Amino acid sequence: MVTLAYFILAASASPQVQQLTYGIAKTGQFLFPVMWVMLIQRHRPKVWPWSAKGLLFGIIFGLFVAGIMLLAYRFVLRSAPFFLSAANEIREKIDGIDIGSPTIFAAVGVFYSLIHSLLEEYYWRWFVFGQLSERTSLIKAIVFSSLGFMAHHVLVIGTYFGFLSPITWLFSFGVAIGGGVWAWLYHRTGSLLGPWTSHLLVDAAIFAIGYQIAFQIPTN
């Protein structure tokens, strides 16, 4: 619902309205877990341990995924007709939310890689996976939380490649795999440091590709 609100329903609005919608939606999303635990479950939210256990695995997995993405973009996607067509729409979106300068785009990329990735780990692994793991088996908790993590990415990817496109579902399935690995790692270590570090490396690669799409691929 959050992605639907700011990415699709507000897509034709002014940059200011889109940014405001994004801010309100994201604030609600990231406040919800704490409010749920405190007001519904009547628990004091536990601060997860920042153990380095699992950090090396997280770094290796993050670098592996980031490397695959960058290589796929460099040697396959960059010149693919379907990707060039999507690149035009991606540039329009970037301009539409008023982050079309290299400096602003880079700053947004740093924010997403460092801060937003941590907030997503807190939401999807600590809260969604954590709540599910208390109510069902480990495998089901990993699968369902990862599919939820994938779902909002489907809305974003499908906007550019088409919701019936195999590319949309291939990329989205990759997101689900990543979410599953991070949920498993969080379960094994009890720490978000490994999943967060892994996630931020992947997000950094996404924004590196996005930067090239926005400012280096010739427009059609």
Positions of predicted regions on the chain:
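Juxtamembrane helix-loop-helix connectors linking adjacent transmembrane helices
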Residues: 14-19, 45-116, 134, 166, ...
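N-terminal, membrane-interfacial amphipathic/helix-forming hydrophobic leader that caps
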Residues: 1-57, 204-220
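Transmembrane helix-loop-helix hairpins at the membrane interface
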Residues: 103-220
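Alpha-helical transmembrane segments
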Residues: 1-6, 61-66, 144-148
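Hydrophobic alpha-helical segments of integral membrane proteins
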Residues: 37, 62, 66, 70-71, ...
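Juxtamembrane "helix-exit" motif on the non-cytosolic side of transmembrane helices
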Residues: 6-16, 76, 154-160
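Membrane-embedded alpha-helical segments of multi-pass transporters/permeases
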Residues: 34-38, 70, 74, 154-158, ...
